């Protein structure tokens, strides 16, 4: 079969591989829509170590082509939504207290695509524990909306969940790329009173306002911390870091109240280091909670995301502002995401077989 792969650090292209075979609890699928994520390009450039001949991609809606003999809930021809994180549910690590199912066999190990197996930019790909990880595409939910639920929406919302946004809170969202935009939307759904979004690109700013941002702050207008403190007349209740660099953590700690929360959903390079001045963290006595996490996976999580879409609570498909047709266009969409033109939010590729 054909797939689009990382071929070493900074290298990518088409390769041929053997078609996967479904294990007893697994399914083999072929994508009908895929979205390109900055994590795909980041991985290709060696952000998590060198990948050689590893098929990329982790955001997809797909058709079931094979199921294992223990799979009960899916059959050939079903159109399903595939969460980006597909835990091995039998792993004992998922039974730990306060366990996030993203870490079934180690750090982020439930994120099988890219980390331990080929991804979805292929004619066929496999999903482990199909009954516990896949979800039938609900009637009334578009393929475009569903493919955005698999990662962008789930990840952005997880940031808001970690931040523990309460009714009437003021929240700051660092970065309004696709994940940050979903954090803005999630904060509105959770009842935030004021949502301050940090970003500069005009189309992202416009969409942030549509999703619920009440204020936009730009580094081009001066020091971010000073701007936010002036806007709020003091510190804010919580912050979600969905973009930026290690310095964003320092900025977040400077703007969040005592007893507040800083939630990080931004992936950092191994070369980056947090250097937190003790004053920013109240000499270690501020009771500010610092959390960072990878979005949960599995069918139940995805059903909840799709329920919000089906009932008109959110329209994540608005993130998709570049659309391609045909499997071979994955290459063009990948290059686009790697180059990141200023007007890009998110590309999708629709596939007909």
What are these regions (language model features)?
Residues 88-174:
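NAD(P)H dinucleotide-binding glycine-rich loop of Rossmann-like/cofactor-binding domains
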Residues 79, 136-221, 226:
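Mid-domain Rossmann-like dinucleotide-binding core that forms the NAD(H)/NADP(H) cofactor-binding site
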Residues 228-237:
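A short acidic, Gly/Pro-enriched loop at the edge of an enzyme's catalytic core
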Residues 209, 245-313, 351-353:
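Glycine-rich phosphate-binding loop and adjacent beta-alpha segment
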Residues 1, 222, 250-254, 298-353:
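C-terminal hydrophobic helical "lid"/dimerization subdomain
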Residues 20-34, 45-95, 118, 138-140:
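Glycine-rich beta-strand-centered segment in the early N-terminal region that forms part
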């Amino acid at each position: 079969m054909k797939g689009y792969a990382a071929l070493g650090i900074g290298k990518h292209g088409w390769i041929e591989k053997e078609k996967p075979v479904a294990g007893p609890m697994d399914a083999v699928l072929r994508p009908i829509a895929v979205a390109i994520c900055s994590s795909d390009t980041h991985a290709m450039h060696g952000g998590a170590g060198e990948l050689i001949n590893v098929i990329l991609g982790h955001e997809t809606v797909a058709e079931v082509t094979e199921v294992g003999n223990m799979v009960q809930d899916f059959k050939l021809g079903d159109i399903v939504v595939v969460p980006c994180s597909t835990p091995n549910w039998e792993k004992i690590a998922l039974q730990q207290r306060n366990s996030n199912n993203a870490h079934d066999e180690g750090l982020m190990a439930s994120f099988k695509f890219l980390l331990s197996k080929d991804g979805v930019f292929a004619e066929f790909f496999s999903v482990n524990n199909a009954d516990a990880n896949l979800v039938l595409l609900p009637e009334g939910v578009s393929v475009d909306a569903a493919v955005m639920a698999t990662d962008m929406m789930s990840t952005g919302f997880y940031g808001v969940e970690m931040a523990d946004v309460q009714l009437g809170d003021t929240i700051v969202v660092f970065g309004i790329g696709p994940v940050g935009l979903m954090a803005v939307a999630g904060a509105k759904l959770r009842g935030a009173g004021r949502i301050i979004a940090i970003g500069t690109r005009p189309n992202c700013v416009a969409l942030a306002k549509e999703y619920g941002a009440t204020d936009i702050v730009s580094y081009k207008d001066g020091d971010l911390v000073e701007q936010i403190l002036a806007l709020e007349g003091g510190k804010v209740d919580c912050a979600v870091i969905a973009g930026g660099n290690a310095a964003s953590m320092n900025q977040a700690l400077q703007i969040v109240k005592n007893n507040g929360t800083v939630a990080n959903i931004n992936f950092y390079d191994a070369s980056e280091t947090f250097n937190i001045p003790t004053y920013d963290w109240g000499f270690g006595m501020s009771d500010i909670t610092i959390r960072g996490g990878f979005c949960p996976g599995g069918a139940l999580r995805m059903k909840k995301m799709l329920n919000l879409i089906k009932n008109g609570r959110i329209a994540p498909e608005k993130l998709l502002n570049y659309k391609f047709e045909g499997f071979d266009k994955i290459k063009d969409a990948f290059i686009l995401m790697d180059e990141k033109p200023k007007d890009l939010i998110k590309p999708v590729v629709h596939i007909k077989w």
